[in-house]
Structures are given as structure tokens and as C-alpha cells.
Amino acid sequence: MMSAKDMVKVMVVMFAICFLAKSDGKPVKKRSVSEIQFMHNLGKHLSSVERVEWLRRKLQDVHNFVALGAPIAHRDGGSQRPRKKEDNVPAENHQKSLGEADKADVDVLIKAKSQ
């Protein structure tokens, strides 16, 4: 075994090495600008590849969905048949009286004719 004096000498030497290195848990060598740019480009590339892969999977799902013969619904979720005029009734709180609607139409027509 080591004596206490030898152990103290080893501890002092280790302390001196650690104190003079001044690493404080940080990397001793700083990265060059080209390394930082490379890492940035790599990160952008990886995120781009991830987006392309996600899009490819989504398009494949849509392709498979259509290939199975499933009907495609419109974005609003409605049917594909044209709507009747009676179905297009505005909400009651937004309805204008007949005079207001006619006046607005006349104003628009007058402006259009004057140009």
C-alpha cells in the first residue's frame, strides 16, 4: 500500500494538473468555423430528410387510400352533389333587409359603370 505522504503527493500533483488545465468541463479545443457550419448544414439536411420522408409516407397513404377505391370527401366534409338554392340560407343574424341588399347592389353597379 501507499503511505500517507505518497498519497498526499499524488493528490497535490493531480490538483495541480486539474488547476492548470482550466477545462472546467468545457472542451479544451474550440471548434473552427467550418466545423460549426458543417454541423449546422448537417442539422438542416437531417430535418429536411425527415420532412421529405414524412411527406412521402403521407402521399403513400393517400395513394393507397385512392387505390382501394374509397371515395374522397371535400375539405368541408360535405357531399359532392351541388347544393340547392334553398340550402344556402344565411344565418338569421346576418340577414339584411331587402332594401339594404338592393341599395348595396345598386351602389356597386353605379361604381362599375362609371369606370
Curated annotation (Swiss-Prot):
Pfam annotation, one family: Parathyroid
InterPro entries referenced in this protein's UniProt entry, alphabetically: PTH, PTH/PTH-rel
Zinc-finger as UniProt keyword: no
Keyword Transmembrane listed: no
Gene Ontology biological process terms from the UniProt entry: cell-cell signaling; intracellular calcium ion homeostasis; positive regulation of D-glucose import; positive regulation of glycogen biosynthetic process
Propeptide boundaries: 26-31
Xref: SMART domains: PTH
Highest taxon listed in the record's lineage: Eukaryota
One annotated Gene Ontology cellular component of this protein: extracellular space
Segments for region (Disordered): 72-106
Localization annotation: Secreted
Similarity-based family: Belongs to the parathyroid hormone family.
Subunit organization: Interacts with PTH1R (via N-terminal extracellular domain).
Protein name per UniProt: Parathyroid hormone
Species annotation: Felis catus
Chain's gene name: PTH
